[in-house]
Amino acid sequence: MAAHAAHAASLLKSLAHPARLRVLCRLVEGEAPVPELQAVTGLSASALSQHLAVLRNLDVVATRRQAQTLHYRLLEGPALGVLQALHAAYCAPQR
């Protein structure tokens, strides 16, 4: 149980960055190319690349290359449910 709690805390700490949350909020809606993620976040290409590397290392996102463009998507896993709940609470259009 302690190991699971430590892993969960590490994951949540890594997700707890506003720029990463903006990326993930967009990816909950479906796959997106890097230029779109850059537009959504307002980050430079370099900064976005660093944030995406953190998410790849956590096995939260995966990539697919189409010509010269990388597309990102969320992976199934423990983080997905958390991200879907956050999206519903904070990112989804208000009704």
Q: What is each model feature region?
A:
Residues 39, 50, 56-57:
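Alpha-helical residues within the helix-turn-helix
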